[in-house]
């Protein structure tokens, strides 16, 4: 608090579903504290943070920090609603003066009061009527209950009055590192970054793997995929966000020898799954949506999944339309990067007539024709793990 009771701008972030965790709530809040501390360190933010039962409060916010803090807390899993507020002690004269500054440029106003301190002398209804009456008598400002030009929200805590200046939604979910580890198959397209982000929001620490081939990929393509990983992880602020780049060139040449060209994409994606599973994450994430492309029919997905029977694969987009996925990609901020032109491995490798009803017996027979797939997979994974 500054001299002369100057208002202190704070940021209130409510926990959302963390409050419902019962005996485990403290574990989730403890991890949220670690995540906020890590993010603040990366972003060189030194503001004090007070952790309360159902929310955290960032103090001493200056105007130049608002955009940075909003960008962080909009994306930080575990938080629901966030509020910037002016904080003053229980001084009604100062509260009225600040309210007058907020509403004076508007033709009408409405006051809403939330009394978090139930021992405060007035109840919420009586206090908002009192404030509105005082604004009319002192400043001739017109209150209006229906369709006002501005609605001002005031909260009453044990020691302070709060005037809410801005509110925005967090993404909810659970703090990262509370659910385990996940490896996202990142193609560079629209879908996979959205899928990774949705799983990250459920408390997973997400890393990424992408598959490149020569000569279809170059430094620009890899740079694009790295930017997508950075966008999902908020430049490693939300999770570790490591990107594994697997050179698929030799495996692609090996797969080109199969006798049934239409099965090429199915075999390739089985290789992707197998490679990703060898990194021993708790689960894999893919951007597959049912029926969106030939490899994503239910028959093909079952055959692809069969190569990793002991690996849990999360497909958060499985029932979504492309329009909805694009909407989420735009909200996430990955859409413009995703639509930059590049050649992904699936596109380079696509047959003219891909099968949509793959049979496991046929796939296993085709794989038996390939002599070096296992060796190439193990060598490629070992190389990345040792880097």
UniProtKB/Swiss-Prot annotation:
Keywords: ATP-binding, Cytoplasm, Nucleotide-binding, RNA-binding, Thiamine biosynthesis, Transferase, tRNA-binding. ATP binds at residues 185-186, 210-211, 269, 287, 296. Its main location: cytoplasm. SUPFAM superfamilies: Adenine nucleotide alpha hydrolases-like, THUMP domain-like. It catalyses: [ThiI sulfur-carrier protein]-S-sulfanyl-L-cysteine + a uridine in tRNA + 2 reduced [2Fe-2S]-[ferredoxin] + ATP + H(+) = [ThiI sulfur-carrier protein]-L-cysteine + a 4-thiouridine in tRNA + 2 oxidized [2Fe-2S]-[ferredoxin] + AMP + diphosphate; [ThiS sulfur-carrier protein]-C-terminal Gly-Gly-AMP + S-sulfanyl-L-cysteinyl-[cysteine desulfurase] + AH2 = [ThiS sulfur-carrier protein]-C-terminal-Gly-aminoethanethioate + L-cysteinyl-[cysteine desulfurase] + A + AMP + 2 H(+). Coiled coil: none annotated. PANTHER family: TRNA SULFURTRANSFERASE. Catalyzes the ATP-dependent transfer of a sulfur to tRNA to produce 4-thiouridine in position 8 of tRNAs, which functions as a near-UV photosensor. Also catalyzes the transfer of sulfur to the sulfur carrier protein ThiS, forming ThiS-thiocarboxylate. This is a step in the synthesis of thiazole, in the thiamine biosynthesis pathway. The sulfur is donated as persulfide by IscS. This is Probable tRNA sulfurtransferase. It comes from Mycoplasma pneumoniae (strain ATCC 29342 / M129 / Subtype 1). The gene is thiI.
